[in-house]
Amino acid sequence: MTSDRLARAYLEKAAVRIRALKFLHQEGGYSDVVREAQECVEILLKGVLRCLGIEAPKIHDVSRLLRQRIDLLPKPLKDNLDEVSRISRELRKDRELAFYGADDWIPTEEYSDQDSLEAIRKAERVFEIVSPIIQ
């Protein structure tokens, strides 16, 4: 496994985004928190793939690919892969709705303080698990 400059840049971007999530939450931008938390998790997992020498596909949830390459994963990620995969899938499901909404789904009305706090918790958890791998 290697670390590369782009993967480390992804880690730095994720750290900034996590701080931004807290600001967005304080401002009541709950749907924005959900959307940005998904992007944070996505970039973290793509950073791990880079460290493993795997080209990240242009999709938003790479948890299946991580499972397919479980033999290459470092122990901390392997031990937490179920949790990381669940977080990635859950946030991915909300990605577009949190940003664009729909005629019957207004993001600023649908996402709550609790949804926002949960999204922050998920992003922080993935950061905690994968940051030692990328550094």
Predicted regions and their residues:
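Terminal alpha-helical segments
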Residues: M1-Q135
